[in-house]
């Protein structure tokens, strides 16, 4: 198996939660045809391959597909590269240029909501209803189930269900889905997802959304 690092992205304030991410820091060691097999073997929601750290060129894989954009891999990779002294101010997945920066313990990226297409959001009446959902809920296609914890404060409870047949029945923390929800609501959010993850969003008038969270070595 190729050398890789595991970090947890969008960890909670107590260090719990966080979505595991596989990082292959030297993507040149894994040829294109072997990447999908490695992503499936690792079994994380996503694995990211760094093709050129200086230019920020990256390749994001789920266990079964290539993604043009995903939030948690880019937040996690931005943090890891800075920790290694190889930080890039811009990451370049296939979707486009993604600025990155650090504010204290929070790593941020900025992306366009349109890049997160295919993730449907559904509002529930209460946090209890979201928490009671089966894994996964009936149906097909990506579902981001959410309810207000505190609407005035912009606090949301959410769970993410890929429902794509690749073994990931529930996503612990989904940056792209949180970005989609923030864009739909047109407001900044604090999203509590999974068993202890926290995702931060900040909306801008030009259609971009900032996505941030804590990252720790997994």
For the regions a language model picked out, list residue spans one by one.
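Active-site proximal loop and beta-alpha junction motif in alpha/beta enzyme cores
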Residues: 1-218
